[in-house]
Amino acid sequence: DTSDLPEIVELESSDLASILYTSGTTGRSKGAMLTHGNLHSNAVALTNCWGWKKDDVLLHALPIFHVHGLFIASHCALLSGTPMIFLPKFEVNEVFERLPDCTVLMGVPTFYTRLLSLSSLTPDYVKHVRLFISGSAPLTEVTFREWKEKTGVEILERYGMSETIINTSNPLDGERVAGTVGFSLPGVNLRISDSEGKELPRGEIGTIEVSGPSVMKGYWRMPEKTKEEIRQDGFFITGDLGVQDEEGRVSIVGRGKDLVISGGFNVYPKEIESII
């Protein structure tokens, strides 16, 4: 008897799956409308880019009211049908105790700085973990270097946001450069543009814009704001300032609204932080 089972509804990839509220640095919260197609395309891209395996075990201690914990981390495991150790919150000692039981840890930079404070963190202790991923906030070059020195493993940093999910990632196999967020994912078109949307040459700082199957449908009940943020050619204006090297590797230098002009020179927050 299947009468008590929930009804199975036919869905299109363009159907709305989630509304994630985000304010960024612009004040009023905006509801980013993500479709089933957005979520699926990004999950497939990440699963492939990060080489998800059938014997992988994800250690999940991220909040699920945020795109990082709700979609980015959990969808890789769900799509691959692999186990997930789901912790209600990040507690440094509990996460440390579960590290030998996992193969992948996704976290924010604070996870890694707090774990680094533990003297018992050694290469042998984390030998089963093949991938440490960081996002949602910039990972400092100091943390990147200290983690490698203490564990023998390089953290993989990536870059994304609620409106686009993940845009770029450092490579699974290949050089991971401290202070960078890697290359655009397959299917993601990324450009560095001036204020008019004109693409800038490699090496010049400008606004990061992205297009592709993971870019949101728009902002919930905010059509004018949607038109402001998504250009007619489909590129979403992230508001983040960045630069690409000759290989296409992306570095983020700050938010456009945080730029300071002093004596005719552009001063970027990341430059100040690196000096301090």
Language-model features: locations:
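AMP-binding/adenylate-forming catalytic core of the ANL superfamily
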Residues: 97, 160, 212, 217-218, ...
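Conserved beta-loop-beta connector loops within the AMP-binding
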Residues: 191-209, 228, 244-247
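Conserved pre-ATP/AMP-binding loop-to-beta segment of ANL
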Residues: 3-21, 28, 51-57
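Short beta-strand->loop structural element characteristic of the AMP-binding/adenylate-forming
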Residues: 30-33, 60-61, 82-89, 156
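Conserved S/T- and glycine-rich ATP-binding loop of Class I adenylate-forming
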Residues: 16, 22-25, 58, 64, ...
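Conserved AMP-binding/adenylation subdomain of ANL enzymes
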Residues: 40-57, 65-104, 118-120
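Gly/Ser/Thr-rich phosphate-binding loop
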Residues: 102-107, 116-177, 189
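Conserved AMP-binding A3 loop
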Residues: 17-41
